[in-house]
Amino acid sequence: MPHFVLDCSESILETHSEEQILEQVHMVANSTQLFKEGDIKVRVNPYKKYLVGNKKEDFIHVFANIMEGRSVEQKADLSKMMVQKLADMFPEIPNIAMNIREFEKATYCNRSMIKD
């Protein structure tokens, strides 16, 4: 972790490739120094069918899932940096947003934590 999942309208991929988007989201997350670089995971989910305010209007929304322990200020700065980078990349897209969800260390589990 952390996981950065970017939902977007498929048409934004005409401006920048998925690879470019993945790289830039990773770069912003890494630049905060809140996470180990090797732990950062990024995915892009382009949608063909969607509505924004009952209109087919391009959008980008980043969902960040991170382990608890960062301050509100750190999380707010991460969101602002990410939205700014995406706004710079996609100046024509009016709907760019991000939210951060924290999960508890006590309830998190991954395969490497399971004893054989």
Language-model segment annotations:
Residues 2-116:
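A domain-level signal for the structural core that forms small-molecule/cofactor-binding pockets
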